Amino acid sequence: MGLKCLYKENGDSVTILRCYGEYGRIVLPESINGKKVTELGDYIFSEDMRHKPEGKIWTENGTSEERCADENTAACGSRVREICLPSTIKKIGRYAFYNCYSLKKLAMFSTAVDIGAGAFNGCRQIDELTIG
């Protein structure tokens, strides 16, 4: 199964709310349906998401689905080892990477100027942080 993202549109931009896939390396897209991905939602990669947000599903092959992805394949917690954020990201939501114990590598850009409270709480294994 390839990467799937639960997202919502905010006018001319997109917020990714949750990711799904059965592998530890996640490369987020720069755009979905022609709109720039500018935000990561609260608890996006955390196993402790309080409630599942509403949105549409985008798939890696470029299609959109209306149905919800299976939460058992959510890319969260110890399943996540490496994340590459696109240069279009401006905001990282609260507790976005909360308790991602196995996260070792994070690549992001200096365009991410709004990082929510507790975004990296519990990320004890990060040994490579790349900021472009």
Language-model segments: which ranges?
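Short secondary-structure subsegments characteristic of cysteine-rich extracellular domains
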Residues: 44, 48-49
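Structural signature of tandem-repeat unit edges
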Residues: 2-12, 20-38, 50-91, 101-114, ...
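Consensus positions within tandem repeat domains that build extended binding/scaffold surfaces
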Residues: 43, 93-96, 116-121
